[in-house]
Amino acid sequence: MTDKELGIHTEEVQIDGTDSFHCHRYEPTSYEVLEELFYHYTPMENDVIVDYGCGLGRLNFYVENRFSLMSTGVELTDRYYTRALRNRETYLGDKEKITFVQCAAQNYEVSPNETVFYFFNPFSISIFRQVINRILLSWQEHPRVLTLILYYPEDDVVFYIEQHTSFALFGEFASGEEVKCDRRERFCLYRLDI
């Protein structure tokens, strides 16, 4: 799969220096890495995916194209949010299944139908905790099976999930050969049951 096949433009890595301790730089998950993820993990047909720090929306377009899933991309930066909306306009698939929301991740109101939450090292542990707390609050109000997908996770994020939440690890695998040089080049998948 490529941007051209989808009618979108997501090939960009943030190099402007505006990333910070709390919000890490934008970099899309490569199509090869997405293929690896979905080789090991198959979402349910009624899953709704939320991509926190979605940038230009690559994951959202990918899951709609491959699985016909609904998704929401949460993006703080105006520039990326605007370009994600532009990508939605030019996308060759079902635009109606893709939503973008501009807000801070910790302020995003999790909908009762959202079940899978994707994180590509988007922000600091202090913000991550707040996001997870909102997800857990939604789960308490509307019990359902939830899945967290962490790509390129920092140690403090993994520790927090495993020691301070009820999510249980159900899958961990390398995202490619790069894991030999950087152990963060992996996926950690967690589930919270009813």
Question: What would you call each of these model-derived segments?
Answer:
Residues 46-55:
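Conserved class I S-adenosyl-L-methionine
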Residues 126-188:
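C-terminal substrate-binding/active-site "lid" region of AdoMet-derived donor-dependent transferases
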